[in-house]
Amino acid sequence: RQDEPLILSSASGYQLNPKLHIMTDYQRFDELVSSAVRASSVINKVDILKNALDLYHGKVLSSADGEHWLIQFSTKYHLSYMGAVSELLKQLDSLHSYDLLNQYAMKSLTIAPDNPKAYCWLIRSLKAQGMNELATNELAAAKEHLTTEEYEEILAFGANW
């Protein structure tokens, strides 16, 4: 299929040539997140979500961030990523898998420092491990990165620590 063009142009815009059966990381991410919802066990769900999150490295085409044609697509995947992270962290907490929880929470906060749920699960995990000073440091970081309302949400969640 070397004679097939990679990108097709139409009246509605550009698209990857469907005859080439190309799957992007973002399509694979969507597929994995959907599979995680249907997973039969917590362990399967965790494995699938880890695979999905390992594909996500930040906003789609960040060099074109703010372009009107990209905003809806980029926002959809960013919100889907934050939802998948929150679900993975919740499942890891239920398994008391704190090392993995810490790892994925920290990675997610480098990609999306505006995710209050990642802070919640990370702080909860650190406290569960007796790492109170680190938990306090993360709470301070959350206060810097989040809105007042989001920060108060973390404090309310903290009543369960």
Residue ranges and their predicted role:
Residues 1:
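DNA-recognition element of transcription regulators
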Residues 6-161:
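Intrinsically disordered, charged and Pro/Gly-enriched terminal/linker segments
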